[in-house]
């Protein structure tokens, strides 16, 4: 069973990157990385889904999800080691995947300071904010 990793006092500002290393749990069909203001305000919900070979990104504002952005790209599998870089820019997020592919998702909520990070479905070995 996966455990959730959560940081509630993140100090991520525009121009900064978050580097994550970890191992995807063996018993999951997806994992998530969330960045935002709190559990109910997510500027970026990043959710690779293995059974669909798709990466889903979205925004949560209160109880309202935005329109999903789906990208058909598969470089993740249960039990694999991963390195990801999430770069927070004024107008968007850039996510660099383990295979070098990158995707961009708009900063729909417009915040310039992120306070919240959660990850689920991963065993984190390191994360670095720079």
Curated annotation (Swiss-Prot):
GO BP terms: cell-cell adhesion; positive regulation of apoptotic process; positive regulation of inflammatory response; T cell homeostasis
The UniProt record lists the keyword 4Fe-4S: no
A Gene Ontology cellular-component term: galectin complex
Domain Galectin residues, every copy: 4-130
Binding site for a beta-D-galactoside: 65-71
InterPro entries: ConA-like_dom_sf, Galectin-like, Galectin_CRD
This protein's record includes keyword NADP: no
CDD domains membership: GLECT
A molecular function GO annotation: carbohydrate binding
SUPFAM superfamilies: Concanavalin A-like lectins/glucanases
PROSITE patterns the record matches: GALECTIN
Assigned keywords, A-Z: Lectin
Function: This protein binds beta-galactoside. Its physiological function is not yet known.
Assembly, per entry: Homodimer.
Protein name: Galectin-2
Protein's organism: Rattus norvegicus (Rat)
Gene that encodes the chain: Lgals2
